[in-house]
UniProtKB/Swiss-Prot annotation:
GO terms for molecular function: molecular adaptor activity; protein kinase activator activity. This is Autophagy-related protein 17. PANTHER family: AUTOPHAGY-RELATED PROTEIN 17 (PTHR28005:SF1). Keywords: Autophagy, Cytoplasm, Membrane. The gene is atg17. GO terms for cellular component: Atg1/ULK1 kinase complex; phagophore assembly site; phagophore assembly site membrane.
Length: 551
């Protein structure tokens, strides 16, 4: 729109003197000029868009400043959070490894205990099933098993001690599991907060991507603020251009007022039309000036006289500008619409950054609370379980060794009983051999005695009458007789079957000291049980099988 105006001339209206007929026909009608003045006045309402443009620029600049601060704070917190999260998950992994390692070791020890206890119970059951042969016991006594000779109080006490250790370890493990579950709940809560953070970041990234003129998508987890300065610059350019366009509308309005006032009868109309002008605001590029003030000054200013040519030139410019005024108004509206859209994107990015910052601070506060209050408890619970397990593992290992010793003792008892049966059979066999030797010897001694008696009697008959009786007093004595006398064997130290650890080796001197001197048996021969051959063969087979298993 041209800013040309007519030259200043004196006079309040167009003079009639000297006007040519053609010139009068070419002059515009007053109502036409008034319609242009009314349209120019209406176009000045675009000043509201310019005022809104200034508000948008101010709001966008404040949003950009806030985004820079929030983005910097968020980036700083994220770096700290990444380190804390790595440390937190490392602690959780270590605590879980302690739990799994302890659980595995405990399960292995329990399996060993179960195996040892099963072997011991099987041995005890064999003791119950093994009935002592009645030949070993006094006549009339109720049947007894080998288990009747075993004191199980040691087994019961050992089981009680092992149960106490197992219960304590199980309780410590349950406490650790509960602590780990609480730890997992903490991590789940943090994971949910991270999900909120990622959702906000994804939303912000999509908004940032959609607001950019480029078609490429953003993969950043944080919305980029690199596009916001260009947006702000675009808004400032729009605001500046809108101010310039508004100035051109003001100049067009001034020109319309001047033209109407220079037209006969137009002064009063100009004052009537311009009596209720919109409140003006400072226009960019013209800081310190006010549109309303400027218009009022123009309305009240005295008119300078114009020549016909100057007037005609002014009218031509007015008509040309009037044709463009509507386009200028539309351009201002388009620009304010574009600015509103850009501001919406800027504020959306600011809100997204706020959401990310709030999510980040929530995670940071959660981690801070966790690290200062609950995390030390989770770590302490893992250390407590480790300490309890080490203590009870030593006790359980000792109990496992005791179970093995008891099983060995009772297996030795079973083996000794089978050995006793074989020993009885051996002694029976020896006794039979001794009796045979005694019978054979008695028979030979009796033969020798009879032969000696016969020979002595023959000698006495043949030679006795010739020998004086005092030549040898023993000549008439009968031959000596030999008798066998049974002597009881000395008793040896009894064998203790209750505690192999308390048995001590007996030296030869101790054996000699503990052995009683042989005495004549007053109760008859040693009683050797008469065992069935089948029983002896079974005992011998078991001994042989155990010896084979041992190798």
């Amino acid at each position: 729109m041209s800013s040309s105006e007519s030259s200043s001339v004196s006079g309040g209206g167009r003079p009639d003197a000297g006007r040519l007929p053609g010139e009068e026909q070419a002059m515009p009608r007053l109502d036409t000029l008034i319609s242009h003045l009314v349209a120019a006045k209406r176009s000045l309402s675009s000043i509201n868009h310019v005022w809104r443009a200034n508000e948008i620029v101010t709001a966008a600049r404040a949003a950009l400043e806030e985004c820079v601060v929030v983005s910097a704070r968020t980036a700083f917190l994220r770096r700290g959070l990444n380190n804390q999260l790595r440390l937190l998950y490392s602690v959780r992994t270590e605590v879980e490894e302690i739990s799994l390692r302890g659980r595995s070791e405990f399960a292995a020890v329990l399996k060993d205990l179960d195996d040892a206890d099963t072997r011991l119970r099987r041995t005890l059951e064999l003791l119950r099933e093994t009935i002592v042969h009645p030949a070993f016991r006094p006549e009339g006594e109720d049947p007894k098993s080998l288990h009747d000779f075993v004191d199980e109080r040691g087994v019961e006490e050992l089981h009680a001690a092992l149960k106490s250790s197992i219960d304590r370890t199980t309780a410590a493990q349950a406490q650790l599991d509960s602590s780990n579950h609480a730890f997992d709940d903490e991590l789940l809560s943090i994971k949910e907060a991270l999900g909120t953070y990622r959702t906000a970041a994804k939303l912000a990234s999509s908004r940032s991507s959609s607001s950019a003129s480029s078609s490429s998508t953003s993969n950043s987890s944080l919305p980029s603020i690199s596009t916001m300065p260009s947006m702000l610059h675009s808004l400032e350019m729009h605001a500046q251009e809108m101010a310039n366009l508004l100035e051109s509308l003001v100049r067009h309005f001034d020109l319309c007022v001047t033209a109407v006032k220079h037209t006969e009868g137009g002064g009063a109309a100009a004052k009537s039309i311009t009596g209720d002008m919109p409140v003006g605001v400072p226009v960019s590029g013209r800081m310190g000036s006010n549109i309303e003030e400027e218009i009022n000054n123009n309305l009240n200013a005295p008119l300078d006289p114009l020549s016909n040519s100057e007037y005609q030139e002014m009218v031509n410019v007015l008509f040309k500008d009037a044709a463009e005024a509507e386009d200028v108004v539309m351009e201002i509206q388009d620009r304010i619409g574009e600015m509103e859209s850009v501001l919406e994107n800027v504020l959306a990015q600011r809100d997204a950054l706020r959401s990310i910052y709030n999510a980040t601070t929530d995670i940071y506060q959660h981690l801070s609370s966790l690290g200062s209050t609950r995390l030390p408890g989770y770590i302490a619970q893992a250390h407590n379980f480790t300490q309890v397990w080490h203590e009870e593992n030593d006790r359980i290992s000792g109990g496992l060794a005791d179970l093995s010793d008891l099983n060995s003792l009772y297996n030795g008892f079973l083996d000794a009983y089978d050995g006793l049966i074989v020993e009885v059979a051996r002694r029976k066999h020896v006794r039979q051999r001794v009796e045979k030797v005694l019978r054979d010897t008695r028979h030979k001694l009796d033969q020798l005695y009879e032969e000696d008696v016969t020979a002595r009697e023959t000698f006495r008959v043949e030679k006795g009458d010739y020998l004086p009786s005092d030549i040898w007093p023993e000549i008439g004595r009968e031959p000596m007789r030999i008798e066998f006398r049974r002597i009881s064997g000395a008793k040896v130290q009894a064998v203790n079957l209750q505690s192999p650890n308390e048995q001590e080796a007996i030296t030869d001197e101790q054996k000699t000291a503990n052995r009683l001197a042989p005495v004549e048996s007053k109760d008859g021969d040693e009683i050797i049980p008469d065992l069935p051959r089948e029983l002896v063969e079974q005992a011998f087979a078991r001994l042989k099988a155990r010896a084979k298993d041992a190798t």
